[in-house]
Amino acid sequence: MAQTELNVSQREGLGKGTARSLRREGLIPAVMYGKGVENCSLVVEPKQLAAIIGSEAGLNSLITLKGEGAFDGKVVILKDMQVDPIRQTPLHVDFQAIDLNAKTHVLVPLVVVGKSEGEKQGGNLQIIRHEVELVCLPANIPANIEVDVTALNIGDALHVQDVQLPEGVEIPQDVNFTVVTVTGRTAEVEEEGAEVVEEGEEAAEAGE
């Protein structure tokens, strides 16, 4: 995965008051931490961050921080981001410094591709999980993992251990949750339920 640069600056002052002041100025408070590195309080420019999030790698981009401070040149990933529930804009960002030669755990989006045989027969595809935890070197972090559902019939389920992964990418061995399932014909079930209700109403009327 290609790396991208992000210009940041050292944040002067801590606490909620400082963070609120930065947001009023249109900036995003952030922090960088990681094994063997000095924790740094930072300030991020929203447009630069938005460009990274909107890239192909998205939230799993490898980012090289640039600026004057101990953080300069550190390679990080976006570990956490607090978002305004109404405006959907970032309120605070956590960057985790990583070692490019050590495997890391990341959450990657799952993308369903294809139309299942069960859907063609009138079934309903239910997506149970939208992301998966992966273990890999930072350079091998994928933007997403595709889940091919074309072979699934009604009653079938696909588990995370069944998902095809890129080379150099692993799923923790103790994890095997259900990703998608194909259930029966919901339309028929609803129709049958309506018929039962109608029959019950007719029986009630006959008994009056």
UniProtKB/Swiss-Prot annotation:
Top-level lineage group: Bacteria
Q: Which UniProt keywords apply?
A: Ribonucleoprotein, Ribosomal protein, RNA-binding, rRNA-binding
Q: Which GO terms describe its molecular function?
A: 5S rRNA binding; structural constituent of ribosome
Q: Which InterPro entries match?
A: Rbsml_bL25/Gln-tRNA_synth_N, Ribosomal_bL25/Gln-tRNA_synth, Ribosomal_bL25_b-dom, Ribosomal_bL25_C, Ribosomal_bL25_long, Ribosomal_L25_dom, Ribosomal_uL5_bac-type
Query: Which is a GO BP term held by this UniProt record?
Result: translation
Q: Where does it sit, as one GO cellular component term?
A: cytosolic large ribosomal subunit
Give any Pfam family that matches.
Ribosomal_L25p
Which SUPFAM superfamilies does this UniProt record tie to the protein? Ribosomal protein L25-like
NCBIfam families, per this entry? bL25_bact_ctc, PRK05618.1-2
Family classification: Belongs to the bacterial ribosomal protein bL25 family. CTC subfamily.
> What do we know about how this protein assembles, alone or with others?
Part of the 50S ribosomal subunit; part of the 5S rRNA/L5/L18/L25 subcomplex. Contacts the 5S rRNA. Binds to the 5S rRNA independently of L5 and L18.
Sum up the protein's function in the record's words.
Answer: This is one of the proteins that binds to the 5S RNA in the ribosome where it forms part of the central protuberance.
Q: What is this protein called?
A: Large ribosomal subunit protein bL25
